[in-house]
Amino acid sequence: MIRIGHGFDVHALGEARPLIIGGVKVPYHTGFIAHSDGDVVLHALTDALLGAVALGDIGKLFPDTDMQFKDIDSRILLREAFRRVKEKGYAVGNVDVTIIAQAPKMRPYIDAMRAVIAEDLQCGIDQVNVKATTTEKLGFTGRSEGIATEAVVLLVKA
């Protein structure tokens, strides 16, 4: 049996904090405005995992009203979601992530993001794809006001 999950996340840019995307620190003059570290890639992926096994979403499991998740490393959230996926008897078939951002440029960091995700999801790097695109300077991402991400995951019965 296979299951497919889809996730989406967006955060505004504007805080004086590190910009963490896909578990990787990306040099930039500003970071995400968020309750956690704001990692849009890992948040979208966490939602995709949870959705694939009908466990709700990131806000249900890790509400932004709970101070224990304030400034938390999103890798912790991803690993916990994946632990629950494994409890249901599934493993990752593959992951496909699309980052939507005008700036900063993601290409130099994509291989590191893939490695982080593969490690956290206990799969091969060849099962993880991360790509980035722009909106050709249209909308909030085009004005570099925020970054959005979509993620799709295919789970297979372990």
Curated annotation (Swiss-Prot):
It comes from the Bacteria. Disulfide bonds: none annotated. The record marks H35, T134 as: Transition state stabilizer. Binds 1 divalent metal cation per subunit. It catalyses: 4-CDP-2-C-methyl-D-erythritol 2-phosphate = 2-C-methyl-D-erythritol 2,4-cyclic diphosphate + CMP. Its EC number is 4.6.1.12. A divalent metal cation binds at D9, H11, H43. The keyword NADP does not apply. Keywords: Isoprene biosynthesis, Lyase, Metal-binding. One of its GO terms (molecular function) is metal ion binding. The keyword Lyase applies. PROSITE patterns: ISPF. One of its GO terms (biological process) is isopentenyl diphosphate biosynthetic process, methylerythritol 4-phosphate pathway. PANTHER family: 2-C-METHYL-D-ERYTHRITOL 2,4-CYCLODIPHOSPHATE SYNTHASE, CHLOROPLASTIC. Homotrimer. Belongs to the IspF family. This is 2-C-methyl-D-erythritol 2,4-cyclodiphosphate synthase.
